[in-house]
Amino acid sequence: MSHAKEDYDSSYDPYSYQADYDGHTGDPKQDLAYERQYEQQTYQVIPEVIKNFIQYFHKTVSDLIDQKVYELQASRVSSDLIDQKVYEIQDIYENSWAKLTERFFKNAPWPEAEAIAPQVGNDAVFLILYKELYYRHIYAKVTGGPTLEQRFESYYNYCNLFNYILNADGPAPLELPNQWLWDIIDEFIYQFQSFSQYRCKTAKKSEEEIEFLRSNPKIWNVHSVLNVLHSLVDKSNINRQLEVYTSGGDPESVAGEYGRHSLYKMLGYFSLVGLLRLHSLLGDYYQAIKVLENIELNKKSMYSRVPECQVTTYYYVGFAYLMMRRYQDSIRVFANILLYIQRTKSMFQRTTYKYEMINKQNEQMHALLSIALTMYPMRIDESIHTQLREKYGDKMLRMQKGDAQIYEELFNYACPKFLSPVVPNYDNVNPNYHKEPYLQQLKVFLDEVQQQAQLSTIRSFLKLYTTMPVAKLAGFLDLPEQEFRIQLLVFKHKMKNLVWTSGISALEGEFQSASEVDFYIDKDMIHIADTKVARRYGDFFIRQIHKFEELNKTLKKMSQKP
């Protein structure tokens, strides 16, 4: 689907919620749900160590905001003091919060914002940030997951956060670590995805819950989410900044009043990746890649400071290429990011959620790469190829023989969790309605697999000969000659891909064939050419020699220790 820029006019605010939600509505069912939410709240005793932590967390954020206000009044973008405060917040966010969660709230929620509000002087901005972490923890770790009310409240909190950032008269006096900014965008889309699937599963829901969903169609609406992401992109002027950056210019020169601040610049960049993800979940792969048209994927960028953002970008771009039948580009993207993960895996602590997420996407991308290489055999990095053979060697052989069940199994494991942007008809919801987006994408994928079912066998026969009568080769395959000619045409068509060669836009490219065999038909004779490039063993041996030398040095150092 194509979205014109005016569809996301920031003056239109579909993600704003009804003001009367916080009071009685006159609807008995809605009021009952509202009252039940507060009746069930239990005011837990907050441990002293948590009180001290929250006060310290608040003071750090408050000091940063005060300093940022001063910097803005002095017309300065940033300073060493701001950087120092951001570093302190990063330590709190990535270390202290995680350790205290593990110790006190492993499977239980943190104290509610209302309970800690007196500790922080009812600081509205801090409470919004606290609730962002509070609800995210409920989604990730709390047994049973979020209730319907918590899903709604988390949505309202994101509305408050984005309104604070987007609707201020000037740049908001706030800076946050890049990791937290990425996690905000990532979690925002995840919660939308989770709610989209939740509202489609009506079998176990009470009439009260269904009525509550029916009367609040704007909550977690797809237009709300798109509007937020596009507003952040527009506010930051990130596309223009990237355009100038990739052409060798200074992005600051076109950043504008908001985009020169790290908060807006990074949220804008992460929102582009968020749009890539969202359009992929909706099955619009062309639009998914189009939003990245100013990001040069094949070049290390100053904006790529968060590993999870890098991995997510390459996962969705690689998957979109696969579904667009651009196998060569899909293979290149997956191989590049898998090599990156292989070389940087030691950076991630094995106990953190980061490691879990990256490890899962690493496994999924290996599965997708095995599919792409089966459908379009070509050479890739030796170390990645070795890993692939270890993990999926047997399944790749079965896929080469046309086993559709293995294709489906790997696709099911590795594909994104597709969703429908449409609110279901609650009066008549199919029990499998939540599966329909996945089944639609699976059908598209398996149709393509079916079209290529004979190609692997044809390729293996073509490799054996230089010339062969068409009728004879058709006989080997037990196909009528006319059907075999059709399959040869399919082979020619499917082995020719649109391939990115240069330029910034990932949609650009030229038609190429990387098939190891090529042929032409002259009258009733097939003439076959082996286009396989001889393997360069020299590079492989040089890499192994370097590894051996490093190992030798390490062993010598160990032997020298007293």
UniProtKB/Swiss-Prot annotation:
Biased composition (Low complexity): 11-20
GO cellular component, as recorded: eukaryotic 43S preinitiation complex; eukaryotic 48S preinitiation complex; eukaryotic translation initiation factor 3 complex
Alphabetic keyword roster: Cytoplasm, Initiation factor, Protein biosynthesis
Domain PCI: 329-535
Any one Gene Ontology BP term: formation of cytoplasmic translation initiation complex
Description of how the protein assembles with itself and partners: Component of the eukaryotic translation initiation factor 3 (eIF-3) complex, which is composed of 13 subunits: eif3a, eif3b, eif3c, eif3d, eif3e, eif3f, eif3g, eif3h, eif3i, eif3j, eif3k, eif3l and eif3m.
HAMAP family per the UniProt record, alphabetical: eIF3l (MF_03011)
Protein family membership: Belongs to the eIF-3 subunit L family.
Known function: Component of the eukaryotic translation initiation factor 3 (eIF-3) complex, which is involved in protein synthesis of a specialized repertoire of mRNAs and, together with other initiation factors, stimulates binding of mRNA and methionyl-tRNAi to the 40S ribosome. The eIF-3 complex specifically targets and initiates translation of a subset of mRNAs involved in cell proliferation.
Name listed for the protein in its UniProt record: Eukaryotic translation initiation factor 3 subunit L
